[in-house]
Regions:
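Residues within the helices of the helix-turn-helix
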Residues: 31, 42, 52
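Amphipathic alpha-helical packing segments from all-alpha helical-bundle domains
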Residues: 86, 94-97, 110-141, 155-159
């Protein structure tokens, strides 16, 4: 009878995050995750079909927290600036927490196809809290995409908002 390991999925994700921080995306493997958690390779594959699926889950779990924080900022504000500021802070924090993935050439190559699939979803999630401040759907999505692009490019919030505020 197989042994039951409490919170194994969380342990696998924690181990992956730790290995990425210490050694980078390229050095982390399903085998190294299994070894770090004291389980067989097949056990890891029961939870994650591939290394990239494991990484995607790691990123998704953190992103859910970002979306919750943005939602809270949105529901507590009658003006767009605090909401956009929260989005900016969540995006910069997210990238900083996962820079070993985002700025790794092997990871970029592995995830190149996924980026286009998730771009619309990401833009839509960021546009959602902006819709009530905008006159139409396109403007909310345009602001979301602009904020995402310029935040990822390392631009200062005040400079970005100076332009975006003209669209509200």
């Amino acid at each position: 009878m197989p042994k039951i390991i409490e919170n194994l999925k969380d342990r696998l994700l924690t181990e992956a995050k730790q290995q990425i921080e210490e050694s980078g995306y390229g050095a982390m493997t399903i085998r190294s995750i299994a070894k770090g958690c004291g389980v067989g390779v097949g056990t890891v594959y029961n939870y994650f079909p591939s290394k990239d699926d494991l990484i995607a889950e790691l990123l998704l779990e953190d992103w859910k927290g970002c979306i919750q924080a943005i939602g809270a900022a949105s529901s507590g504000s009658d003006a767009p600036r605090p909401v956009v500021r929260c989005m900016y802070e969540q995006l910069t924090g997210y990238v900083r927490r996962h820079e070993k993935i985002f700025y790794d050439e092997a990871a970029a190559a592995a995830f190149a196809g996924s980026v286009s699939r998730y771009d619309g979803l990401l833009r839509g999630q960021l546009a959602q809290p902006l819709r009530r401040f905008c006159g139409d759907e396109f403007t909310a999505e345009f602001i979301a995409e602009s904020l995402l692009t310029w935040t990822m490019a390392g631009k200062d919030f005040d400079r970005i908002y100076q332009i975006l505020e003209k669209l509200f």
